[in-house]
Amino acid sequence: MRKPYTLVEILVAVSIIGILTATGLGITGYVRNKVAETQTKTTIKLIEMAFQKYNEKTGSYPVTEDKNGSDLTPFLAIEIPKDWTVNDLKWITAFNDVTLPQSTSTNPTASGLKIRGIRLEETNGSANHRKYYFLDGWGRKLICLNPGIFNSSTSYDLISFGGDKLAGDGSTKKSIRDCENEQQDIFKSQTFYPDEIGDDVTNFTRN
C-alpha cells in the first residue's frame, strides 16, 4: 500500500506547479507583446506608405486631426460624413486595400471602413459623421503628430506607447490618459523623444 504524501512533498509539488504556472504566464505575456509590437510596426509602415503616396499626388501630407469638441487630440483618426464622396477621402484611398463605407437609405450613417493590415476602432461620432481611430497592436489609439517634432525624415510623427501605455521609459510622465485629456501639443516642450529602454513603437529613431 502506497504511503500517503508527506506535507513536505505536497508543498514541494505545489511550489513546482506555481513556478511552472508563473513561467508559462510570463512567456505568454512576452509572446503577446512581441505579436502586438510586430502588428504595430506593420501598421505604421502601411500608414507611412499611404502618406507618401498621398504626398506624391498632392505635395502635402493629409490632415489627420481628431477633434474632440474645440480641442485637438493627438490620435490618428478620420471622420466620414454620411454624404461623403471619394474625393473627400483622398488620403484613405492612398492605402492599397480599402473597403469604403457605403451610405444608403437603410444605413444613413457611413460605417464599415476597413483597411487590410490595420485595426480600426469605429465610434458613433455624430448624426452626420462616423469616426474611425487607427489602433496599434495593443488595441490602443495610434498617435500622429502633424506637424511632427521628432522625425527628421518626414513632417509627421507616428507613435505607439506600447504595452506599458507610457511614453518612452515613463520619465516624461506622459501616458495614454494624458493624450485623452490634452491637446495635440502634448509633446510641445520636448526636443527629443526621451526613450532608450521603453517599449514604444515609432516611425523615427529614438535617442
Task: Please identify what each model-predicted range represents.
Residues 1-31, 40:
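N-terminal single-pass transmembrane signal-anchor helix
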Residues 37, 41-207:
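N-terminal pilin/flagellin-like segments and related low-complexity appendage regions
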